[in-house]
Amino acid sequence: MRILNASGCLDGLTAPAQSLDSFVTKTVTPLPRAGNPPPRIAEVEGGMLNSIGLQNPGIEVFVTNVLPRLVEVGVPIWVSVGGFSAGDYATLCERLDECDDVVTIELNLSCPNVEEAPETASELVAAARAATAKPLFAKLSPATWDIAETARAVADAGADGLALVNTIRGLALDENLRPRLGSGTGGYSGPALKPIALACVYACANAVDLPIVGMGGVSNGRDALEFAAVGASAVALGTILFSDPSAPDRVRAEIESETLTIGYELTKGKRPDVSNSATFPTVSAK
Protein backbone atom coordinates (compact mmCIF):
# COMPACT_ATOMS: atom_id res chain seq x y z
CA MET A 1 0.00 0.00 0.00
CA ARG A 2 1.45 3.34 -1.01
CA ILE A 3 2.20 5.95 1.64
CA LEU A 4 2.26 9.69 1.01
CA ASN A 5 2.32 12.72 3.29
CA ALA A 6 -0.60 15.06 3.72
CA SER A 7 0.12 18.42 2.13
CA GLY A 8 2.11 20.73 4.39
CA CYS A 9 2.91 18.12 7.05
CA LEU A 10 6.52 17.35 6.15
CA ASP A 11 9.51 19.24 4.84
CA GLY A 12 10.39 17.65 1.52
CA LEU A 13 14.09 18.23 2.08
CA THR A 14 14.29 16.06 5.21
CA ALA A 15 15.27 12.41 5.43
CA PRO A 16 11.75 11.09 6.26
CA ALA A 17 10.52 12.34 2.88
CA GLN A 18 12.78 9.78 1.23
CA SER A 19 10.72 7.03 2.88
CA LEU A 20 7.52 8.09 1.13
CA ASP A 21 6.21 6.60 -2.10
CA SER A 22 5.35 10.15 -3.21
CA PHE A 23 5.86 13.57 -1.63
CA VAL A 24 3.01 16.10 -1.59
CA THR A 25 4.05 19.76 -1.38
CA LYS A 26 2.48 22.52 0.62
CA THR A 27 -0.33 24.21 -1.29
CA VAL A 28 0.95 26.69 -3.87
CA THR A 29 -1.09 29.69 -5.03
CA PRO A 30 -0.66 31.95 -8.09
CA LEU A 31 0.85 34.80 -6.05
CA PRO A 32 2.90 34.76 -2.83
CA ARG A 33 0.98 34.62 0.46
CA ALA A 34 2.33 35.69 3.84
CA GLY A 35 -0.06 33.42 5.73
CA ASN A 36 -1.97 33.94 8.95
CA PRO A 37 -0.71 35.62 12.15
CA PRO A 38 0.87 33.39 14.82
CA PRO A 39 0.29 31.23 16.71
CA ARG A 40 -0.53 28.93 13.82
CA ILE A 41 -0.53 25.49 15.48
CA ALA A 42 -2.08 24.27 18.72
CA GLU A 43 -2.10 20.77 20.18
CA VAL A 44 -5.61 19.85 21.32
CA GLU A 45 -7.55 16.82 22.50
CA GLY A 46 -7.45 14.11 19.86
CA GLY A 47 -5.14 15.95 17.49
CA MET A 48 -4.12 19.46 16.55
CA LEU A 49 -5.37 22.70 15.07
CA ASN A 50 -3.52 24.59 12.37
CA SER A 51 -4.10 27.86 10.60
CA ILE A 52 -1.15 28.45 8.29
CA GLY A 53 -3.07 30.55 5.81
CA LEU A 54 -1.55 28.96 2.71
CA GLN A 55 1.82 30.66 3.22
CA ASN A 56 3.88 30.04 0.09
CA PRO A 57 6.19 31.88 -2.33
CA GLY A 58 3.82 31.76 -5.30
CA ILE A 59 3.93 29.52 -8.35
CA GLU A 60 6.83 31.17 -10.17
CA VAL A 61 9.24 31.08 -7.24
CA PHE A 62 8.08 27.56 -6.42
CA VAL A 63 8.81 26.28 -9.92
CA THR A 64 12.13 28.11 -10.19
CA ASN A 65 13.60 27.68 -6.71
CA VAL A 66 11.68 25.13 -4.65
CA LEU A 67 10.80 22.35 -7.08
CA PRO A 68 14.41 21.67 -8.24
CA ARG A 69 15.46 21.06 -4.62
CA LEU A 70 12.53 18.76 -3.96
CA VAL A 71 13.38 16.67 -7.00
CA GLU A 72 16.78 15.92 -5.48
CA VAL A 73 15.07 13.97 -2.67
CA GLY A 74 14.40 11.23 -5.19
CA VAL A 75 10.69 10.49 -4.76
CA PRO A 76 7.81 11.36 -7.13
CA ILE A 77 6.46 14.86 -6.54
CA TRP A 78 2.79 15.77 -6.18
CA VAL A 79 2.15 19.52 -6.14
CA SER A 80 -0.83 20.81 -4.18
CA VAL A 81 -2.41 23.92 -5.68
CA GLY A 82 -5.07 26.27 -4.38
CA GLY A 83 -6.83 29.37 -5.58
CA PHE A 84 -9.92 31.51 -5.31
CA SER A 85 -11.35 31.10 -8.80
CA ALA A 86 -11.40 28.76 -11.76
CA GLY A 87 -8.88 31.04 -13.43
CA ASP A 88 -6.45 30.57 -10.55
CA TYR A 89 -6.57 26.78 -10.87
CA ALA A 90 -6.15 27.01 -14.64
CA THR A 91 -3.11 29.28 -14.27
CA LEU A 92 -1.47 26.99 -11.73
CA CYS A 93 -2.06 23.81 -13.69
CA GLU A 94 -0.94 25.36 -16.96
CA ARG A 95 2.36 26.35 -15.36
CA LEU A 96 2.89 22.94 -13.75
CA ASP A 97 2.04 21.19 -16.99
CA GLU A 98 5.43 22.42 -18.22
CA CYS A 99 7.25 20.73 -15.32
CA ASP A 100 8.32 17.19 -16.17
CA ASP A 101 9.25 16.48 -12.55
CA VAL A 102 5.66 16.94 -11.34
CA VAL A 103 3.85 13.61 -11.61
CA THR A 104 0.48 14.59 -10.12
CA ILE A 105 -1.38 17.77 -9.19
CA GLU A 106 -3.53 17.84 -6.06
CA LEU A 107 -6.36 20.35 -6.29
CA ASN A 108 -6.96 21.79 -2.83
CA LEU A 109 -10.66 22.54 -3.13
CA SER A 110 -10.96 23.49 0.54
CA CYS A 111 -9.26 26.87 0.28
CA PRO A 112 -10.72 29.84 2.20
CA ASN A 113 -13.48 31.67 0.34
CA VAL A 114 -13.96 28.83 -2.13
CA GLU A 115 -17.45 27.42 -1.71
CA GLU A 116 -17.24 23.65 -2.07
CA ALA A 117 -20.70 23.06 -3.49
CA PRO A 118 -20.65 20.28 -6.12
CA GLU A 119 -21.18 22.70 -9.01
CA THR A 120 -18.35 24.95 -7.80
CA ALA A 121 -15.96 22.04 -7.32
CA SER A 122 -16.87 20.81 -10.80
CA GLU A 123 -16.09 24.21 -12.30
CA LEU A 124 -12.68 24.35 -10.64
CA VAL A 125 -11.73 20.83 -11.72
CA ALA A 126 -12.92 21.46 -15.27
CA ALA A 127 -10.71 24.55 -15.48
CA ALA A 128 -7.73 22.58 -14.21
CA ARG A 129 -8.46 19.70 -16.57
CA ALA A 130 -8.45 22.01 -19.58
CA ALA A 131 -5.03 23.34 -18.55
CA THR A 132 -3.08 20.12 -18.05
CA ALA A 133 -2.82 16.49 -19.06
CA LYS A 134 -1.24 15.55 -15.73
CA PRO A 135 -3.22 13.41 -13.27
CA LEU A 136 -5.48 15.51 -11.05
CA PHE A 137 -6.51 14.48 -7.54
CA ALA A 138 -9.29 16.54 -5.98
CA LYS A 139 -8.86 17.09 -2.23
CA LEU A 140 -12.23 17.43 -0.55
CA SER A 141 -13.34 18.64 2.86
CA PRO A 142 -15.49 16.50 5.16
CA ALA A 143 -17.53 19.65 5.83
CA THR A 144 -18.98 19.70 2.34
CA TRP A 145 -22.62 19.47 1.28
CA ASP A 146 -22.75 15.82 0.26
CA ILE A 147 -19.25 14.49 -0.24
CA ALA A 148 -20.41 11.63 -2.48
CA GLU A 149 -22.26 14.10 -4.70
CA THR A 150 -19.17 16.31 -4.82
CA ALA A 151 -17.05 13.27 -5.70
CA ARG A 152 -19.34 12.47 -8.62
CA ALA A 153 -19.20 16.09 -9.76
CA VAL A 154 -15.40 16.28 -9.80
CA ALA A 155 -15.15 12.86 -11.45
CA ASP A 156 -17.45 14.02 -14.25
CA ALA A 157 -15.34 17.19 -14.59
CA GLY A 158 -12.17 15.19 -15.20
CA ALA A 159 -10.56 14.40 -11.85
CA ASP A 160 -8.38 11.29 -11.96
CA GLY A 161 -8.55 10.60 -8.22
CA LEU A 162 -9.61 11.87 -4.81
CA ALA A 163 -7.70 12.90 -1.68
CA LEU A 164 -9.93 12.37 1.37
CA VAL A 165 -10.17 14.24 3.62
CA ASN A 166 -8.95 17.71 4.44
CA THR A 167 -9.23 19.11 7.96
CA ILE A 168 -12.46 20.21 9.60
CA ARG A 169 -12.82 23.61 11.25
CA GLY A 170 -12.19 23.78 14.99
CA LEU A 171 -11.55 26.23 17.81
CA ALA A 172 -9.47 25.97 21.00
CA LEU A 173 -9.34 28.44 23.88
CA ASP A 174 -6.48 29.22 26.26
CA GLU A 175 -6.61 29.62 30.06
CA ASN A 176 -8.01 33.13 29.58
CA LEU A 177 -10.74 31.85 27.27
CA ARG A 178 -9.14 33.42 24.23
CA PRO A 179 -8.47 31.64 20.92
CA ARG A 180 -5.17 29.77 20.94
CA LEU A 181 -4.63 30.47 17.24
CA GLY A 182 -3.84 33.90 15.89
CA SER A 183 -6.61 33.67 13.32
CA GLY A 184 -9.16 32.27 15.77
CA THR A 185 -10.26 29.01 14.20
CA GLY A 186 -8.18 26.45 12.35
CA GLY A 187 -8.20 23.07 10.66
CA TYR A 188 -8.68 20.15 13.07
CA SER A 189 -6.70 17.01 12.27
CA GLY A 190 -5.44 13.90 14.01
CA PRO A 191 -6.86 10.64 15.42
CA ALA A 192 -10.24 12.16 16.30
CA LEU A 193 -10.83 12.86 12.61
CA LYS A 194 -10.46 9.21 11.56
CA PRO A 195 -14.09 8.05 11.92
CA ILE A 196 -15.22 11.02 9.84
CA ALA A 197 -12.55 10.38 7.23
CA LEU A 198 -13.40 6.68 7.02
CA ALA A 199 -17.07 7.50 6.45
CA CYS A 200 -16.16 9.96 3.69
CA VAL A 201 -13.84 7.50 1.93
CA TYR A 202 -16.49 4.79 2.12
CA ALA A 203 -19.18 7.07 0.70
CA CYS A 204 -16.99 8.23 -2.17
CA ALA A 205 -15.67 4.76 -2.97
CA ASN A 206 -19.26 3.66 -3.47
CA ALA A 207 -20.05 6.74 -5.56
CA VAL A 208 -17.18 6.85 -8.07
CA ASP A 209 -14.65 4.50 -9.61
CA LEU A 210 -11.54 6.56 -8.88
CA PRO A 211 -8.40 5.86 -6.83
CA ILE A 212 -8.60 7.42 -3.38
CA VAL A 213 -5.81 8.61 -1.09
CA GLY A 214 -7.23 8.25 2.42
CA MET A 215 -6.09 10.57 5.19
CA GLY A 216 -7.30 11.83 8.53
CA GLY A 217 -5.90 10.26 11.67
CA VAL A 218 -3.66 7.63 10.08
CA SER A 219 -1.11 6.88 12.81
CA ASN A 220 -0.28 3.19 12.39
CA GLY A 221 -0.60 0.19 10.13
CA ARG A 222 -4.02 -0.77 11.45
CA ASP A 223 -5.35 2.69 10.58
CA ALA A 224 -3.99 2.31 7.05
CA LEU A 225 -5.70 -1.06 6.60
CA GLU A 226 -8.99 0.40 7.81
CA PHE A 227 -8.77 3.01 5.05
CA ALA A 228 -8.03 0.24 2.56
CA ALA A 229 -11.05 -1.69 3.80
CA VAL A 230 -13.38 1.20 2.99
CA GLY A 231 -11.94 1.88 -0.45
CA ALA A 232 -8.65 3.78 -0.26
CA SER A 233 -5.89 2.88 -2.70
CA ALA A 234 -3.21 4.67 -0.66
CA VAL A 235 -2.91 6.62 2.58
CA ALA A 236 -1.35 9.93 3.55
CA LEU A 237 0.23 10.65 6.92
CA GLY A 238 -0.32 14.06 8.45
CA THR A 239 -0.51 14.97 12.13
CA ILE A 240 1.52 11.93 13.20
CA LEU A 241 4.55 13.34 11.34
CA PHE A 242 4.82 16.22 13.81
CA SER A 243 5.49 13.82 16.69
CA ASP A 244 7.04 10.95 14.74
CA PRO A 245 8.83 11.99 11.52
CA SER A 246 9.91 8.37 11.00
CA ALA A 247 6.27 7.23 10.80
CA PRO A 248 6.37 6.26 7.08
CA ASP A 249 8.79 3.38 7.69
CA ARG A 250 7.01 2.30 10.87
CA VAL A 251 3.55 2.35 9.31
CA ARG A 252 4.77 0.42 6.28
CA ALA A 253 6.19 -2.31 8.52
CA GLU A 254 3.00 -2.40 10.59
CA ILE A 255 0.89 -2.78 7.46
CA GLU A 256 2.86 -5.87 6.54
CA SER A 257 2.51 -7.38 10.00
CA GLU A 258 -1.20 -6.54 10.23
CA THR A 259 -1.95 -8.15 6.88
CA LEU A 260 -0.44 -11.39 8.17
CA THR A 261 -2.26 -11.15 11.49
CA ILE A 262 -5.76 -10.56 10.12
CA GLY A 263 -5.40 -12.28 6.76
CA TYR A 264 -5.93 -9.31 4.47
CA GLU A 265 -4.33 -9.35 1.03
CA LEU A 266 -2.95 -6.13 -0.42
CA THR A 267 -2.82 -6.50 -4.19
CA LYS A 268 -0.82 -3.82 -5.96
CA GLY A 269 -2.69 -1.91 -8.62
CA LYS A 270 -6.18 -2.94 -7.54
CA ARG A 271 -8.73 -0.93 -5.61
CA PRO A 272 -10.95 -2.57 -2.98
CA ASP A 273 -14.50 -3.51 -3.91
CA VAL A 274 -16.77 -1.76 -1.42
CA SER A 275 -20.06 -2.25 -3.22
CA ASN A 276 -21.64 -4.41 -0.53
CA SER A 277 -19.94 -3.87 2.80
CA ALA A 278 -17.18 -1.99 4.56
CA THR A 279 -15.63 -5.23 5.83
CA PHE A 280 -14.18 -8.08 3.83
CA PRO A 281 -12.24 -11.32 4.36
CA THR A 282 -9.89 -10.11 1.61
CA VAL A 283 -9.08 -6.50 0.79
CA SER A 284 -7.10 -5.40 -2.25
CA ALA A 285 -5.38 -2.04 -2.33
CA LYS A 286 -2.82 -0.29 -4.44
What are these regions (language model features)?
Residues 3-7, 23-25, 77-81, 105-107, ...:
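Hydrophobic faces of well-ordered beta-strands that scaffold small-molecule active sites
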Residues 14-17, 91-96, 144-157, 206-207, ...:
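Catalytic cores of alpha/beta
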Residues 28-30, 107-111, 163-171, 217-218, ...:
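Glycine-rich phosphate-binding active-site loops on the catalytic face of alpha/beta enzymes
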Residues 57-73, 119-138, 182-212, 251-260:
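Alpha-helix-loop-beta-strand connector modules within alpha/beta enzyme cores
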Residues 35-45, 173-186, 228, 240-266:
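C-terminal helical cap(s) of enzyme catalytic domains, especially alpha/beta-barrels
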Residues 1-76, 83, 251:
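N-terminal capping/small domains of soluble enzymes
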Residues 48, 109-119, 150-210, 250:
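Glycine/Thr-rich beta-alpha phosphate-binding loop at enzyme active sites
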